[in-house]
């Protein structure tokens, strides 16, 4: 069994990095510790120009770089020095003049940055596929019993700390090894994804000839948290996040207080935050079981998020119990006080949490308080995944959204200006409600939400029941449907409860009948031409 605590010193290091963040300081510290440094190309020049006494790999191997730098470190004196097992291969290493290399600091050609550039063609991409780097990384990682491999600049400080303490322990080298294989796996996956989008039947030099989906799909996620259990107590679970941080999300949020997030907390918080991101003016979204149960938008001069919370809560006070609350503005102390005094809440998330709000919520130690930061107005493109038995469904993220200018009026009566505001609001909410989704709204407040029914008309009935139960007036409210009405019964039902305007995608074989039903009831109806199924 390997001794976990014995420290191995470093006498010789090879440094060759594309990302030179912190490398000069790292090399200087190594030199002060008496470490002999081997280096290549641009890294060697940087070190030499800044007074670090490094040996160029070509001088060390006696074999010059060739083929425009394609062959630099692929030499037995390099890989033998990395792969050689101390105490096993010493004789053969001595016979061939191979010196042991105890530490390898390497990161790889910037393939991702290269292919992200406009106009990047296949030859350019190919020249930015690192060969020597991954080979050294894998060699050092394989021989981690004797060699330390450093691929992240963030590890330089801890490596130096270990060396100053007498060397790196096996536990440290094992952790560095794991990071190295994660690094090369992500790198190769990125290359495979890119190459897998190229259609060889077309012009392989053209970015326009690329498919949207690669032949194999490779993506890397990093474990952020192991959870007590999954969706149910008998299921095990963990939370993995994308290796590269994107826009503000539940994955990037900082937890300021409260119990550890559960599996369901994460899923529901994501639903709440993504919904509230849809609104420009101050908004509050309350979610239960991944469905919005209350949403409201209130301008700053009319009460802002404090009033928005009151209205969102009023939609469905029963469902709000134990829910998730999201805001698109800084959470202030007054709003925080209203929440914790009124209801039991699992999670509160906002782009920023004021100190006053922190102080208020601190009295409720179990409440999870998350600060996610601001997000851009333009939503980033990305992928959504759905696991099925034996496979994975992959689709582009549903960033589609309409404005008032996109609406097509299909009835005799056009909606009023206030109805248009409410229709667009209700449509934004319906996008985040499980299908079949029906949302009743009035004055930019949800007054009834019907979610997840197999029949669209039943979702409409549930929305009306919810509104009545909450004591909210449906008369003069608008209705949003995430997909078209297959029959006129949905409109007939809306007319009975007093709905004045409807927003839906359109596209049914019976659109004419549905429009006629709206005209008969004096209901204004608009088509969006865009569906928002959510399963």
Curated annotation (Swiss-Prot):
Pfam family membership, one: MGS
UniProt cross-references to InterPro entries, sorted A to Z: AICAR_Tfase_dup_dom_sf, Cytidine_deaminase-like, MGS-like_dom, MGS-like_dom_sf, PurH-like
Top-rank lineage group of the source organism: Bacteria
Keyword Hydrolase: yes
Any single GO CC term annotated in Swiss-Prot or TrEMBL for this entry: cytosol
Catalytic activity reported: (6R)-10-formyltetrahydrofolate + 5-amino-1-(5-phospho-beta-D-ribosyl)imidazole-4-carboxamide = 5-formamido-1-(5-phospho-D-ribosyl)imidazole-4-carboxamide + (6S)-5,6,7,8-tetrahydrofolate; IMP + H2O = 5-formamido-1-(5-phospho-D-ribosyl)imidazole-4-carboxamide
Chain ranges of the MGS-like domain: 6-151
E.C. numbers: 2.1.2.3, 3.5.4.10
Gene Ontology annotations of biological process type: 'de novo' IMP biosynthetic process
Pathway terms, separated by semicolons: Purine metabolism; IMP biosynthesis via de novo pathway; 5-formamido-1-(5-phospho-D-ribosyl)imidazole-4-carboxamide from 5-amino-1-(5-phospho-D-ribosyl)imidazole-4-carboxamide (10-formyl THF route): step 1/1; Purine metabolism; IMP biosynthesis via de novo pathway; IMP from 5-formamido-1-(5-phospho-D-ribosyl)imidazole-4-carboxamide: step 1/1
GO MF annotations in UniProt: IMP cyclohydrolase activity; phosphoribosylaminoimidazolecarboxamide formyltransferase activity
Keywords from the UniProt entry: Hydrolase, Multifunctional enzyme, Purine biosynthesis, Transferase
SMART domains: AICARFT_IMPCHas, MGS
Family: Belongs to the PurH family.
Record comment regarding domains: The IMP cyclohydrolase activity resides in the N-terminal region.
Protein name listed in UniProt: Bifunctional purine biosynthesis protein PurH
């Amino acid at each position: 069994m390997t001794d976990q605590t014995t420290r191995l010193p470093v006498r010789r290091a090879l440094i060759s990095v594309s990302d030179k963040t912190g490398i000069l300081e790292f090399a200087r510290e190594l030199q002060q510790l008496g470490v002999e440094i081997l280096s290549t190309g641009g890294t060697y020049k940087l070190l030499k120009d800044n007074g670090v006494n490094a040996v160029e790999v070509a001088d060390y191997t006696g074999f010059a770089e060739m083929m425009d730098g394609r062959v630099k470190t692929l030499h037995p004196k390099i890989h033998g020095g990395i792969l050689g097992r101390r105490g096993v291969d010493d004789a053969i290493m001595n016979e061939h003049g191979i010196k042991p290399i105890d530490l390898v600091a390497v990161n790889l050609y910037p393939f991702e940055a290269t292919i992200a550039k406009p106009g990047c063609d296949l030859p350019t991409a190919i020249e930015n596929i690192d060969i020597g780097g991954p080979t050294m990384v894998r060699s050092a990682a394989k021989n981690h019993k004797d060699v330390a491999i450093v691929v992240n600049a963030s590890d330089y400080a801890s490596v130096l700390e270990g060396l100053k303490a007498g060397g790196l322990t096996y536990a440290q080298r094992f952790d560095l090894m794991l990071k190295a294989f994660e690094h090369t796996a992500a790198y190769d996956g990125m290359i495979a994804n890119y190459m897998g989008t190229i259609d060889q039947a077309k012009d392989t030099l053209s970015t326009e000839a690329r498919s949207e989906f690669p032949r194999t799909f490779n993506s890397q996620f990093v474990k952020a948290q192991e959870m007590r259990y999954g969706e149910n107590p008998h299921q095990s679970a963990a939370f993995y996040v994308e290796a590269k941080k994107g826009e503000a999300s539940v994955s990037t949020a900082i937890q300021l207080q409260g119990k550890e997030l559960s599996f369901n907390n994460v899923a529901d918080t994501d639903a709440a935050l993504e919904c509230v991101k849809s609104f420009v003016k101050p908004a509050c979204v309350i979610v239960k079981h991944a469905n919005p149960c209350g949403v409201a938008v209130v301008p700053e001069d009319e009460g802002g998020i404090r009033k928005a919370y009151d209205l969102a809560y009023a939609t469905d006070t029963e469902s709000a119990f134990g829910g998730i609350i999201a805001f698109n503005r800084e959470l202030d102390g007054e709003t925080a006080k209203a929440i914790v005094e009124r209801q039991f809440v699992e999670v509160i998330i906002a782009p920023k949490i004021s100190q006053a709000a922190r102080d208020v919520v601190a009295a409720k130690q179990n409440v999870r308080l998350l600060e996610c930061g601001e997000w851009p107005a333009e939503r980033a493109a990305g992928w959504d995944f759905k696991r099925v038995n034996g496979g994975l469904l992959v689709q582009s993220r549903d960033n589609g959204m309409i404005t008032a200018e996109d609406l097509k009026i299909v009835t005799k009566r056009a909606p009023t200006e206030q109805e248009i505001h409410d229709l667009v609001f209700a449509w934004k909410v319906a996008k985040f409600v499980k299908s079949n989704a029906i949302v009743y709204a009035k004055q930019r407040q949800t007054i009834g939400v019907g979610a997840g029914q197999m029949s669209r008309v039943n979702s409409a009935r549930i929305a009306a029941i919810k509104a009545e139960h909450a004591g909210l007036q449906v008369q003069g409210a608008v209705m949003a449907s995430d997909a078209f009405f297959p029959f006129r019964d949905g409109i007939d039902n809306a007319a009975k409860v007093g709905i004045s305007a409807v927003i839906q995608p359109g596209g049914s074989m019976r659109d004419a009948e549905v429009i006629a039903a709206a005209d008969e009831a004096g209901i204004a109806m608009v088509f969006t031409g865009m569906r928002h199924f959510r399963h």
